[in-house]
Regions:
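Metal-dependent phosphodiesterase/phospholipase catalytic core, i.e.
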Residues: 1-87, 103-116, 130, 140
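C-terminal active-site rim and adjoining tail of enzyme catalytic domains
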Residues: 10-13, 85-176
Length: 176
């Protein structure tokens, strides 16, 4: 059954929701795609990536340790871009980052932290420079020290600007 999109008032529109396969075919060779939460369905997603020839355009993310990622995805890591999500408020955050860099060389990390009281995000701007890229998620205020979408709408420099200029973000996940 085909699904229809709804507008901002939750009214059904004539526009259809594409299947993942249709979206992958359309995006082939054009853009990178972050398949959020797709790690839960990795086998099915991987089959579609192979079928559509888009394995090198997909970013899969997760918050597992390097050991668990290697165990779960193994040889797939040679074809699919895997980006670790690291909660900087956890005690072992720096060790987790270094483990991934040493063993997997990820192109980027999604870094999470609740408040600017945490000194680690500022330190990582310099320590990760030239080694990997930094990605921040700005959907909620607890994911990037309150430098989220809402803060950015009020004052760019306190939101996205802070993440880019002060914390070295090269990628920002937003829904605005």
């Amino acid at each position: 059954a085909k699904l229809n999109l709804k507008n901002g008032c939750a009214i059904r529109t004539i526009h259809k929701v594409p299947t993942l396969e249709e979206a992958l075919v359309h995006a082939k060779g054009k853009i990178m795609i972050n398949l959020d939460k797709a790690d839960r369905y990795f086998e099915e997603v991987y089959a579609l990536l192979k079928k559509t020839g888009t394995t090198n355009q997909i970013i899969m993310k997760g918050n597992k340790s390097y050991e668990k990622v290697k165990e779960q995805y193994g040889d797939y890591l040679k074809e699919v871009i895997y980006m670790p999500i690291v909660n900087l408020d956890k005690e072992n955050a720096e060790e987790q980052i270094e483990s991934f860099i040493k063993d997997m060389h990820p192109v980027a990390f999604e870094l999470l932290y609740k408040t600017d009281e945490n000194p680690l995000p500022r330190r990582l701007k310099d320590s990760l420079k030239g080694r990997t890229l930094i990605w921040y998620n700005t959907l909620w205020d607890t994911m990037a020290g309150a430098h989220d979408d809402d803060a950015s709408l009020q004052d760019f420099d306190k939101g996205y600007g802070y993440l880019i200029d002060v914390l070295g973000a090269r990628m920002i996940q937003t829904d605005r």
